[in-house]
Amino acid sequence: MGSHSTGLEETLGVLPSWLFCKMLRFLKRPLVVTVDINLNLVALTGLGLLTRLWQLSYPRAVVFDEVYYGQYISFYMKRIFFLDDSGPPFGHMLLALGGWLGGFDGNFLWNRIGAEYSSNVPIWSLRLLPALAGALSVPMAYQIVLELHFSHGAAIGAALLMLIENALITQSRLMLLESILIFFNLLAVLSYLKFFNSQTHSPFSVHWWLWLLLTGVSCSCAVGIKYMGIFTYLLVLGIAAVHAWNLIGDQTLSNMRVLSHLLARIVALLVVPVFLYLLFFYVHLMLLYRSGPHDQIMSSAFQASLEGGLARITQGQPLEVAFGSQVTLKSVSGKPLPCWLHSHKNTYPMIYENGRGSSHQQQVTCYPFKDINNWWIVKDPGRHQLVVNNPPRPVRHGDIVQLVHGMTTRLLNTHDVAAPLSPHSQEVSCYIDYNISMPAQNLWKLDIVNRESNRDTWKTILSEVRFVHVNTSAILKLSGAHLPDWGFRQLEVVGEKLSPGYHESMVWNVEEHRYGKSHEQKERELELHSPTQLDISRNLSFMARFSELQWKMLTLKNEDLEHQYSSTPLEWLTLDTNIAYWLHPRTSAQIHLLGNIVIWTSASLATVVYTLLFFWYLLRRRRSICDLPEDAWSRWVLAGALCTGGWALNYLPFFLMERVLFLYHYLPALTFQILLLPIVLQHASDHLCRSQLQRNVFSALVVAWYSSACHVSNMLRPLTYGDTSLSPGELRALRWKDSWDILIRK
């Protein structure tokens, strides 16, 4: 034990002297820190921040679509559920993050464009993230052109065009999503190029993995902001697929190495984006747990998962529907309006407006509001009782039931009489015995559409059911047509015989449910008026809520097909349209989404020139005439695939869309054209100008062209920032096209 102690003491005694000697040798050498700073990048970043952050809080008023995004931010602040069909929730959450960082409490009435912001609205913070995204897009354009192996001059040219383009400046200075979408589009392209360029010298290195994963993350973020982001995602996937195909044919790589490359790309470019996309919705639904104004669009099960609203009404209802249950039946379709199966004492007219006759039976409709007349009693046809047995007898798939209207005690009926507005379908009514030769036909077979087995029980909220008429095989269906005044403009319900296949308009679910106990009608009416009071919670899984929300977002159609400032894709190319975003309430200061016409026209021309040159070179190479060296040709093809392909994918799909379109939808496509423009100019200088004199003349023309673009940008500055009040004459002078709508006070 003593010898061990002595050895330890000797070691401790030597250690400090050893460290001391090391420190002396270290201090004798100069301490050198090498920092590699790209001053071009620093300067472009600074200029981008200056142009986007300058007087960012101005105007202190709601500008154009801020009226919509502001509402969504307020919903996030108050944790209220909402549905926006324009895109996934990631972009909205980023805007809400700005509000949260600024301490916004969500209390502001977003009711009109031009409304002055109150003092509690942190407008600088709310507009900060779009402005930062717009500013950082400038240096990213520079880096993308460099990664394509073009010159610093071409890279600076692309960045300067992004810097001075008026429409990009305007869109990034407001609480809007396009600048954030463009940022992630460019980040996805830049990350993939850096990954691709590191492929040859350092595959599977830390940097290689970093850029590959960042590509997938950026693509997912772009799609998560707006569905338009999927166009750039497809662009990256397409180019990555071509490169992967080339890897498969590389004989220098082993089979295991090729498999590793393919798996890495599948994980980073497919698995990671899908995971992140689901994560965006998970966070979105976790934040928005309270009932809100858009609940009615969702299913009863979804509504019941939200705090308040339907959850407050339906909490703890009996799960299994039994004979004698009192229920409300909601149409699963929700189109054209969410509504419930309904009846009232009024009857169908004897003769309709078109001269057809009716059965004069009690009307059955679908009513878009909660009402006492929405309640029905599920009756066993073999028994007279309208109460639930003890123990309850659950209704199962395939059972025959009768539906008794709770307030009038008449049974749901259909027969071979044409419906009032859908003559090819049967009329649905509640049967009144007029003592004539029209027997009751009130038996319905229960068909549980989402059953797991043929003995499934009918469940509250969860089961989606169809009612098949026993006598005629017609299916109870919401036609969606609005009845005339005699039907109080309620929605028509019919018996569908011609197309009995599955359709949401034929599917119903129980929303409110109680076990009936009252034998007398007056007591039963009081029971129908009273709320349910049981205490069992009901939850919906995340994947079920995600699937429903995603489906609603994709299928929900905005009824606004016209707008004062809507435009067509053809008008975007030539900048024949603009959007008046804001007008000062007292002066002529105004903000417009209006592009730099020199840049837009030149960018379109560059796309045409590139396409013609590409096919010219391709035809000549087919004849074994190589105008370009192999490395220059590879650069030319990759640049075109990214820039021209990015423009086409972000532009051409709009010709197929049946929705209201605006000029700002073109901005993502425009950024790809802007990247292509200096590439075409450098190519012309390097490969088309044969002599030094031609190059000098061409360079002078390029400088003059850049100067004209800067001059136009400066002339349009008052309409870009809206901080200058111009006279009517000055405003007319800025109306360079008759189609531009410049606001002039009279």
Curated annotation (Swiss-Prot):
PROSITE patterns of this UniProt entry?
Answer: MIR (PS50919)
How does the protein associate with the membrane? Answer: Multi-pass membrane protein
Sequence ranges assigned to domain MIR in this UniProt record: 318-381, 392-449, 453-513
Q: Which residues have a glycan attached per UniProt?
A: N435, N471, N539
Record's Gene Ontology CC terms?
acrosomal vesicle; dolichyl-phosphate-mannose-protein mannosyltransferase complex; endoplasmic reticulum membrane; sarcoplasmic reticulum
Pathway membership of this protein?
A: Protein modification; protein glycosylation
Disruption-associated phenotype:
Mice suffer of developmental arrest around 7.5 dpc and die between 7.5 dpc and 9.5 dpc. Defects are observed in the formation of Reichert's membrane that are probably due to abnormal glycosylation and maturation of dystroglycan and impaired recruitment of laminin.
A GO biological-process term? protein O-linked mannosylation
Q: Which CDD domains match?
A: beta-trefoil_MIR_POMT1
Localization of this protein: Endoplasmic reticulum membrane
Cross-referenced SMART domains:
MIR
Q: Give the stretches traversing the membrane.
A: 30-50, 90-110, 121-141, 144-164, 176-196, 228-248, 266-286, 597-617, 636-656, 660-680
Q: What keywords tag this UniProt record?
A: Endoplasmic reticulum, Glycoprotein, Glycosyltransferase, Membrane, Repeat, Transferase, Transmembrane, Transmembrane helix
Q: Which reaction does it catalyse?
A: a di-trans,poly-cis-dolichyl beta-D-mannosyl phosphate + L-seryl-[protein] = 3-O-(alpha-D-mannosyl)-L-seryl-[protein] + a di-trans,poly-cis-dolichyl phosphate + H(+); a di-trans,poly-cis-dolichyl beta-D-mannosyl phosphate + L-threonyl-[protein] = 3-O-(alpha-D-mannosyl)-L-threonyl-[protein] + a di-trans,poly-cis-dolichyl phosphate + H(+)
Q: What is its EC number?
A: 2.4.1.109
InterPro entries reported for this sequence? GlyclTrfase_39-like, Glyco_trans_39/83, MIR_dom_sf, MIR_motif, PMT_4TMC
Q: Its Gene Ontology molecular function terms? A: dolichyl-phosphate-mannose-protein mannosyltransferase activity; mannosyltransferase activity
Q: What does this protein do?
A: Transfers mannosyl residues to the hydroxyl group of serine or threonine residues. Coexpression of both POMT1 and POMT2 is necessary for enzyme activity, expression of either POMT1 or POMT2 alone is insufficient. Essentially dedicated to O-mannosylation of alpha-DAG1 and few other proteins but not of cadherins and protocaherins.
- Would you identify the family this protein belongs to, as annotated? Belongs to the glycosyltransferase 39 family.
Query: Under what name is this protein listed?
Result: Protein O-mannosyl-transferase 1
Task: Tell me what organism the protein belongs to.
Answer: Mus musculus (Mouse)
Gene that encodes it: Pomt1
